[in-house]
Amino acid sequence: MQLKARLACQTASFALGLALALPASAGAADALLSGAVKSASGEAMGGVTVSAKAGTITTTVFSDAAGNYYFPPLPSGKYQIWAQALSFATAKNEVDLAASRRQDFTLAPITDYESQVRQLPGDLILAGLPEDTPDDRRLKQIVRNNCTSCHTPSYTLQHRFDETGWNAIIQTMKQINVYGIYRGGGEVNKVLDFHQGELAAYLARARGPNEGGAFKITTRERPTGEAARAVFTEYDVALNPDQRLPAPDHPIDGSDWSLGTPSRVGSLPHDAAPDLDGNLWFAAVVPNRTMSVGRIDAKTGAVKPFKIDAANGMAAVSHGLIRDDKGMIWFNAHISRGSLAKVDPKTEKVSVYIPPTGMSQIDGPVTLDFDGAGQIWAGTGDGVLRFDPAAERFSEYKSLTPKTAKGGVGMTYGVAGDRDGNVWWTQMAFDIVAKADIKTGKSEEWTLPPVVDQIKLANQNDIKFYEGYAPTDIGTPFPWSQGPRRIGIDRAAGVLWVANSWGGSLSRFDTATGNMSFVPLPDPATHQPYDATVDAGHNVWTPMWTTDQIAKYDPSTSRWTLFDLPTRGTEVRIASLLEQNGRKQVVMAFPRASKVAVMTVRSEADLAALKTQAARP
């Protein structure tokens, strides 16, 4: 029998700042803020990140080729405003839009070496590690795949330790699984265990007592063209009050790059999606007593918690969250049994659907999707579940290669429903992409080929070790693994896109024939895609969770566009789209920084109109 629970949402305010913090004079007339950015030597600086914050809302734009920047209309009031670019010190000021609507900046170059390193996003930190010898390149790949399964490289490598210190860190990290659970005395990450000594020596050579060492600071071009026309609106989500964290005088939340990549302690959001009214919903992934999911009012920044009760007064936490084509918000809920939940944004009614005994529960790194028939799909440890919203009934489809094979870590990661009602999923640890045909009831699977260049780097000792190796969790891959993570369907074109997190590529599947090809990311060695989402124009959006960027791929031109995110250490997992009235919003959660963000891209005409308005006296 299907068990269904209906739960009322929690309406109590969330302590420690989840309640509304309004920008000053939020009801006053909107104002235009603009200015120019130049270097200390007087040169105009294009592509500089310029942010303005009031209350819990931060708006970010980028300067154009002439060094000028133009914000969209902002509520009149007082703002903190800052400008930053890699290798330059952050410039800060305050502006009252009731009195002034222009703020110019002069950026001075950073002269302190460690301050330059601290600014870097994860891909540039990784790029700076030595690769002068085959052994260097071999160890660099092990760092990339096995030291970044739960955090960006910049979180650890912004610091320096001697060989003893790096040994102690690796000793600890090899006992923590991908979910952040310490397994002291239990099973360890065998890859880190095997390579521990040489990894510690390698890291100490790069980020050790000697300033600079073998580490090479690299930067990247600042945004131009379409990427420089992006506008970000970020909403702060207060840290988990259960952890009783002290309020710092200068919070490190990734907003000021000079302070480095933040700690993730207390951050709640994981996935995020907009409802049809433009408000933002996010899954709360960290154990807490207040919320399972939260809703952000996009106009005010107010956060409202919705709680599903679990044991001992805790909230049933979530991981995956989507909006279906009817506007309903679906998410998984970890209660006594991994379940599916829905909230109607209009009525705020929450419903919970528990899989019947005998079926797999919805657990693991859960991803959700819906298909062309409106059925909801969710990942399990053994495959996928389909939920029929009309009949309120579950069906199960299991992986051909069971999760117990090859070390027992073959649970489902990505899930996508195609236009014909079929489902596709990935087993990340096994490099498998699977499909269930609903009409025939048959399943099939594809094993992705290894990353050949990485196999060539392995020495004889490595080869001998890996011959008997089986991953201990999804975060302990072979150095040559592809790591198919989350996936997305272009239902109109009949194309599945797979984000290969370790392989630095997208896989393209024809959903009718199963034919597959690869599309490499612009820099496969450092770019790690997490998800793939397709817009109405067939563009593929993939968050690169260690680079603080989101990439757009246009299959018609084979062109990539990289959009810089305004926060350092975002660890963005998924992009959700809202396409209405000719306007596209790209919604992302920043799990490490405890924010939810909306990106829009202005047209050249939009920007020209703002320039004209700003020039008026």
Regions found by a protein language model. Give the residues of each.
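Short Pro-Gly-centered beta-turn/loop motif in secreted/extracellular proteins
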Residues: E43-G46, Y70-K78, L86
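A short, solvent-exposed loop/turn motif at the edges and junctions
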Residues: G55-T56, K78, W82-E94
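The canonical Cys-X-X-Cys-His
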Residues: V143-S154, L199
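Conserved beta-strand positions in repeat-built beta-propeller and related beta-rich domains
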Residues: P274-D275, L280-P287, I329-S336, I376-G381, ...
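Blade-level signature of beta-propeller repeat domains, shared across WD40, Kelch, NHL, RCC1
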Residues: P566, T570-P617
